[in-house]
Amino acid sequence: NKNTPSPTIPDFSKNALVGDTVTFSDQDFSVQNGDGIKLTSITITVLPDPGAGTLTLGGQPLAADSVVKASALAGLRFQSLSQPSVTTTTFSFLPTFDNGTQAQQPTTVTLYLLTAANEAPIARNMDLSTYKNVAITGYFDAVDSEGDTLTFQLMDTPARGAVTLAEDGSAKFVYTPYENKTGKDSFTYVAIDSAGNTSSEAKVTIQINKPDTKVTYADMEGDPAHKASIRLAEEGIFVGSYLNGEYFFDPDRPVTRAEFLTMAMATVGMAPLEDVTTTGFTDDAAIPTWAKGAVSAAVMAGVIQGSRDDSGAPVFDASENITQGEATVMLDQLLNLSDVPLEVFSAQGSDAHWAGQAAANLAASGVIRVEETNSAALSTGLDRAQAAMLLDGALDVLSQREEDGWLPW
């Protein structure tokens, strides 16, 4: 399953104000995939653009093919010109290790010369969970005070699975456990801003559990909602169809208003009313019998209000495909979330979609991402995969509350 990767030193970036000196430390030259292997020296293969400045060691300019011992790297400097003709440059080197090997690919160091100070981003530790043989999609959690675009880099790889980073350098990643592995796994990452600042390392911890259900879906491998679909089955909230000895989740199937309401109520533990024959909505006859108890309980709790038809009468539209905005409002009410500042947790600030406040509340709670709070996303119909991920996030909120000693119902 696991191929032992060769030791390497990842590409990195540094910056300084124009005219200042870039300094280096041992931490900049940390060995990745080394398993105890240490760096002994580096061989400079490409020098920085002389129009930006000069790379020196002990005050003396370095030439191409110069060898710098690891013990001397703290004396490495890049002196910026006071009036550089270029403000971004690179140099490269080949690392040599104490096992006698040299890296197959050079490490590239990007140097940024700034006209104003720029703070490093902050990367946060993360805790995720999945099931045996189920890949999960995650998003690195980092912020930058200047709002710079961030890219991400692994510093330490996991032992029980593999991590695939997004090709576009975004925060998205996929963790795939090795076959039949369970238990705790972890890896570390850093965030790098567009000025070349690198955050401190943050740790992603992943718990790989054996699912408490026999349900496995034939149509969910590789789907970002795979883990969520298994969790809904495990929690007794929803199980897909069973045909010819296999379970199918139908991730692209639209979800109706009645379906999402009943699943969301089951998620938070809110019981439907019993022996309900009529809900009070004008379109009551179109509400499935199995949903009437849930609809009535939700109305009484203020979770739903329905809408008005052309004559002004209240209707629920039970069989209509629910939009992400409508689902967001339902879940916000069921979780009893506090309102958060729109300008912080909304992709559109004060000009948000009518469901923008609910979406911001869910984003602040980690149920959805801020990028999912815009009008376009909230106006689209919800499919089963999206519903599963919403409810999976809600279960995480409830689990955290249980740890904190507070339950919503």
Predicted regions and their residues:
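Exposed beta-strand face motif in extracellular beta-rich ectodomains
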Residues: 87-91, 183-187
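Extracellular/surface recognition and adhesion modules
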Residues: 44, 53-55, 76, 121, ...
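Extracellular/luminal low-complexity segments enriched in Ser/Thr/Pro
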Residues: 75-86, 172-182, 249, 316-318, ...
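Feature responds to low-complexity, polar/acidic, surface-exposed segments characteristic
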Residues: 126-131, 207-226, 239-261, 265-293, ...
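Low-complexity "stalk/linker" and mucin-like segments enriched in Ser/Thr/Pro/Ala/Gly
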Residues: 48-72, 155-170, 241
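Conserved structural position at the C-terminal beta-strand
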Residues: 95-97, 191
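C-terminal edge beta-strand
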Residues: 1-3, 100-116, 127, 196-211
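Extracellular ectodomain surface segments
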Residues: 3-50, 118-155
